Amino acid sequence: MSECGVDEERSLGGAFCAREGRRKRMRVMVTHAMLSYREVISAALEILRPHVETFTVEPENLDREFMSLSPQLVVCSRVTDIVERGALGWIELYPEQASESVVSLCGEWTIYPDMDLDTLLSVLDETRRLYEIT
């Protein structure tokens, strides 16, 4: 386990590419149940944060793709146990169509009554900062 309580077996937090001697790019996985949210968020991240690898995944493939891609941040409509234990950060965006979102960074939860793109980007930036110091 890392300082943040992240299962390092499942996370790339702090991982270096031994052959190349450099840090791997941070990965974000977007897997919201609403297709429009999934596509718009992924497109926005690719434009506004081009230094981050963004993967768009069908919700039913969340756990399998999480294990395969090892993203540091997951944006989803329902967090799973695997994501909760393995991701450095996650955003449960409007779970069950609620008006609020839940964010976890290093296991500390925060509820946001109104998640907007700026807030999502600030969570991504904080996750990246944590990724770089672990």
Predicted regions and their residues:
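Ser/Thr/Gly-rich flexible loops in soluble cytosolic domains mediating phosphotransfer, phosphorylation
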Residues: 90-134
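Hydrophobic beta-strand segments of well-ordered beta-sheets in folded domains
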Residues: 24-29, 70-75, 88-94, 109
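Short, charged N-terminal beta->alpha structural module
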Residues: 20-60
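Short loop/helix-cap segments at secondary-structure boundaries that form the rim of catalytic
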Residues: 66-68, 81-88, 100-105
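Compact, well-ordered interaction domains used in eukaryotic information-processing assemblies
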Residues: 49, 68-82
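Short, polar loop motifs at secondary-structure junctions
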Residues: 59-61, 76-81, 94-99
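Short N-terminal or domain-adjacent regulatory/targeting segments
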Residues: 1-21, 96, 115, 119
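Acidic, metal-coordinating helix/loop segments flanking the phosphotransfer/catalytic sites
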Residues: 57-73
